[in-house]
Design a protein with these regions (language model features):
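Flexible "cap/lid" loop of the alpha/beta hydrolase fold
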Residues: 84, 92-122
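Conserved HGGG/HGGXW glycine-rich cap/lid loop of the alpha/beta-hydrolase fold
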Residues: 1-41
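The conserved beta1-alpha1 loop
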Residues: 5-7, 72, 192
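Active-site loop/oxyanion-hole signature of alpha/beta-hydrolase fold enzymes
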Residues: 30-70, 235
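Catalytic histidine-centered segment of alpha/beta-hydrolase-like enzymes
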Residues: 221-234
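Conserved alpha/beta-hydrolase catalytic His-Asp/Glu region
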Residues: 104, 126-183
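Gly/Ala-rich beta-loop-alpha elbow adjacent to hydrolase catalytic centers
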Residues: 71, 75, 79
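Conserved serine/cysteine hydrolase catalytic core
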Residues: 159-208, 217
Length: 242
């Protein structure tokens, strides 16, 4: 079973180009929405990094094993954490344009979202969809994807983003989240958009070297390389899964 985990501020729409190229049937994969991202946020759900990890582990346990998991952005971070906790459920894993790295201090927007009051002010600006759409495209989100994602960035998602980033102190990871990576299964893969303005390629290279994980760099692609270069990503995944 293929399991695709999106990031922030995305929804499962992220995976549509890739799933189309892979020609997967509905019985071949799952691409759930993170709670609060284009869907309701369950009562009592705290939207912290630990809460989302528990949610993802639950998704994996529901499948039961033999999982080929793929994660992007926060979905990549949650994938790494969940897989390190339950490697027994995973056949292969692949993450794109985000990794758990103790030296990475977070991009500018992550630090703003993590800051009380400032984060709320940023989110007020994100309510203006006419301005947000071109801003997302300028940040590297493919236009066709942005037209689907931006309308779904509602109050629930905005609050979930704030809660998530604050639980991670922006994007600063340490202790078990880092040390647990030693438990990752061997069949891992990195797929990276070369020009990502949020997470520099050097972060991917450092992770690749430290944990001995193959790194594919997609020249000229940005943070959403998994959608922008869906054909190339599909080719890599098919080889990775073989």
């Amino acid at each position: 079973m293929k399991l695709f985990i999106h990031g922030v501020p995305d929804t499962p729409h992220l995976w549509e180009p890739l799933i189309s190229v892979l020609d997967l049937s509905e019985n071949d994969y799952r691409a759930p929405a993170l709670p609060g991202f284009g869907c309701a946020r369950p009562a009592g759900f705290s939207a912290t990094k630990e809460a989302y990890t528990d949610w993802l582990v639950g998704q994996m346990e529901d499948i039961g094993g033999g999982i080929d998991i793929v994660g992007h952005d926060w979905g990549a971070l949650l994938t790494l954490r969940a897989v390190s906790l339950r490697p027994d459920l995973v056949r292969t894993w692949c993450v794109t344009n985000a990794v758990i790295d103790p030296e990475y201090r977070g991009h500018t927007m992550a630090r703003r979202w993590a800051t009380p009051i400032l984060g709320e002010l940023v989110m007020l600006g994100m309510r203006n969809k006419k301005r947000l759409l071109p801003a997302m495209i300028a940040g590297g989100m493919p236009k066709s994807l942005a037209k689907k994602e931006v309308p779904l960035i509602d109050k629930t998602m905005r609050q979930s983003i704030l809660d998530l980033y604050r639980s991670a102190d922006g994007l600063r990871f340490s202790d078990d989240w880092v040390n647990g990576l030693a438990n990752l299964p061997q069949r891992g893969q990195l797929f990276w958009g070369e020009t990502d303005p949020y997470v520099d390629l050097s972060v991917a290279k450092r992770f690749s070297e430290r944990w001995n994980v193959p790194l594919h760099v997609e020249t000229g692609a940005g943070h959403w390389a998994c959608a922008e270069r869906a054909t190339e990503f599909a080719t890599l995944l098919q080889s990775h899964w073989a």
